[in-house]
Every structure is written in structure tokens, then in C-alpha cells.
Amino acid sequence: RDSSTSRGLGDVYKRQDRAYSTSIFNAGSTVGALAAPITIPPLARYFQSIGVGNGWEMAFIVIGGLGFIWMGLWMFLYKKPNVNPRVNAAELEYIEQDNNNPEESKAQQAAANDFDNKKISFLQCFKFPQTWAVFVGKFMTDGVWWFFLFWTPAYISDVYGFASDTGTAQMLIFVLYAITMLSIYGGKLPTIIINKTGKNPYAARMQAMLIFALFPLLALFAQPLGNYSYWYPIIIIGIAGAAHQSWSANIYSVVGDMFPKSTIATIVGIGGMAGGIGSFCINMGSGRLFDYAAETNMTFMGFEGKPAGYFIIFCVCAVAYLVGWIIMKALVPKYKPVDA
């Protein structure tokens, strides 16, 4: 999904608008998470009532089938702007502003077009620091998102005693996901920075990502404030989730700033692989830490047992984005397309 969509956005949006458009498609997963609790259980109960197994199997098949329907629509309806009859002349002119900049000579425009058409093999991608910047940015941060996604229901149950099927727990999760929808506005920030400062898209994105990297620091206070109300950690996790989605939208757009269009999907795929590795590490490590904390009644910063384990992971999540940003900035200090 991420690879193909990022490649498509590279065709239909100019550079300064890509982060905003990416934040919109990124928010789709949040909409799905909000819709899942009110659609999948009723479907499962219906299929169970008519004797189709336990109901859950067919419910998942139906939901998964929607993805194939969307894939079919994409394959038949998507066309590049220059051959799409639904794109008018004014829209096409706006989209192609990056390629038709009046301040650039014809030679510069030709060089830019040649760059976008260059082919880079999968293995060659790893010789560029830009690739490793994306790799590190995804490795350090995707695991935080998936930790919050997978472990928050368990956190609510372990710390506050609300089972995931109770109304209170479902309301807390709903509010958390609703807050993450704020990420749509985060995708707009680089455009605002570009318009106000005249910075190049890469510099504007890195400035925006630094701002987004500061919000997860609030996770340091989630556990202590949770002593007063369970709403505090939920709101903080929601804000951190919104910051992650804004960060993610911009890191996808950074790929389009530095790599040829023909290579965008490959680099996004490499970033996705890095994010998967990071997610595996933090989720497996968290599970083992929580088991150890419960078995040994471990103490940390005034917390005992599993709450101590959660506080440790919250601390890791809080600083992950800032560490990732620093490494990315060290690898690619200034805007520099790959020397393909």
C-alpha cells in the first residue's frame, strides 16, 4: 500500500503538497481502526447466526475482500495526470509546476526530467546515505506506532482493569484513534513553512519532523499522570499517535524529494521493511519485559510489576523520534538528491 500510494502521489502532486496528501491517505488506517469495532463484531455475529462457522472467519474474509475491490478500482481508474481525461488543463499545469519552473533553464528542466527517469537497482539503493536516513527514520519510529496500536488495550486492562470488550475500554480506544486524526493537519505544516520562509521542501519537512518529534516526549508523563485519571495516558498516546502519522507522512515525502520517481516505491518499501523490523523488536521486547516485570515484581521510578515495564517502554517511545531525527539529519544535513 505505502509503496504504490507514495509512487502515485509523486505523479499527481507537486513536492510541497505531497506531505499533506500523504497525511490524508495515512489517516485512512485510523478511519479503519475507528470503524472496525462497530463493523466487524456485528458482521461476525450475523454470520454466526446463519451458521457460518464462528462468524469471525467470514467477517475477516468480507473485510479483506474490500481490499481486492479497491485494488480493482485503482487498476482501472488510476491514470497519470497527463493522460487522465478527468484532469483539466489548469490542474495539469499546477501539478507540473515542478517540471515547468520558469526560473529554470530548459537544460535544468531536462536534467530534472532525466533524473526522475533514472533507474536504480535495489542493491544500489543501499549505497546512498539518503536510503539509510529513511531506513533509520522508519526503524526508530514505526515500532512506537505499532506498540501503541497493539499494546494499549492490554495497558488499559493491566493497569486499570478494563477488559477490551467493556464499554469503557472501547470508548478509550475510540477517543485515542480520534485524536490521531489530527495528523491530517500535520501534513500541511511543511507547505506553510515553505510559503512563509521560502525553504526547499526537504528543509521544510525536516523542520516539521523536528516539531513532530517533540510531541512524543509527552509519553514520559503518561504513566505518572495515569495515577490521577486513565484519560491522561489515553490523550497523550493519541497525541503521540497523531505526531507519528504526521512524521510518517513527511518521511514518505522526503523520499520523493531525494530519489527519482522511478525509485520512490523501492525506497518506501525499504523503509517499510525497516519499520517492520523495528516493530518486531519493540513488540517482542515489550512482551518479554512485561512478563519479566510481572514475575519479578520489578520496580522502576516508583512503579511496580507490569506498570514499571510499561513506563520503561513509554520512555523508549518518547525519545525514539528525536533520536531518529538526529541520525537522519546527520546522514543528510542538507537537501541533496541521490547521485544516481
Which stretches of residues belong to each language-model region?
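Single conserved hydrophobic/aromatic residue that forms the stacking wall/gate
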Residues: 2-9, 13
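Extracytoplasmic gate region of multi-pass secondary transporters
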Residues: 123-187, 244-248, 252, 279-287
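A membrane-interface helix-boundary motif in multi-pass transporters
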Residues: 45-64, 204-207, 288-319
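C-terminal transmembrane helical hairpin of 12-TM major facilitator-type secondary transporters
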Residues: 202-250
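A late C-terminal transmembrane helix in Major Facilitator Superfamily
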Residues: 33, 183, 256-295
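Multi-pass alpha-helical transporter architecture, strongest
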Residues: 70-78, 219-225, 310-340
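Helix-loop-helix hairpin linking two adjacent transmembrane segments in secondary transporters
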Residues: 25, 29-85
